[in-house]
């Protein structure tokens, strides 16, 4: 799929939630996984890209997404919302279970084309953010880093924050880095163009 192909992003729905591969959709539609720590703005990112307010439920309670949520977009591709990581109030046992579920999907899923790894532009990446990026690089899974909540920082400081994040991640210059805001829609076109180019 290329950027030129028409994609009706408003024609989107949540398809199913899955705990393991036996529940995954059984077809060959390309998938884009979205990963990031709890409350990084993943649901807002999905809703903004799809032009819907409440398709992905935003929550004041981090760690609410406990399954892989598959979103069908115009019967041409799927977004897969991965459980938010790094939330302290979730038990170690639950975190380990989520970790195994996420790893199984990322490593074994043939449909997966690219992972959008979301980080918060305001803060240095956490150890969890760094581990996720290193994991994706180790398994040679294509990755796009999206730095969310850009509207919370003056535009003149974006480059400084971007540099800090890239340094902490040991960012591969061949990967894409997008500064994004679900409030101002900064990064919207770049995000879609970059995602579609990977399909």
From Swiss-Prot:
Q: Does the keyword Nucleotide-binding apply?
A: yes
- Organism (species): Streptococcus thermophilus (strain ATCC BAA-491 / LMD-9)
Q: Which GO terms describe its biological process?
A: division septum assembly
State the encoding gene: engB
Q: Which residues bind Mg(2+)?
A: 43, 65
Question: What biological function has been recorded for the protein in this entry?
Answer: Necessary for normal cell division and for the maintenance of normal septation.
The GO cellular component terms are: cytosol
PROSITE patterns according to UniProt:
G_ENGB
HAMAP family referenced in this protein's UniProt entry, alphabetically: GTPase_EngB
GO MF annotation, one: metal ion binding
Indicate the family of this protein.
Belongs to the TRAFAC class TrmE-Era-EngA-EngB-Septin-like GTPase superfamily. EngB GTPase family.
Q: Which cofactor does it need?
A: Mg(2+)
Specify the protein name.
Answer: Probable GTP-binding protein EngB
Q: Which residues bind GTP?
A: 36-43, 63-67, 81-84, 148-151, 180-182
Question: What are the residue boundaries of the EngB-type G domain, all occurrences included?
Answer: 28-199
What InterPro entries is this protein classified in? G_ENGB_dom, GTP-bd, GTP-bd_ribosome_bio_YsxC, P-loop_NTPase, Small_GTP-bd
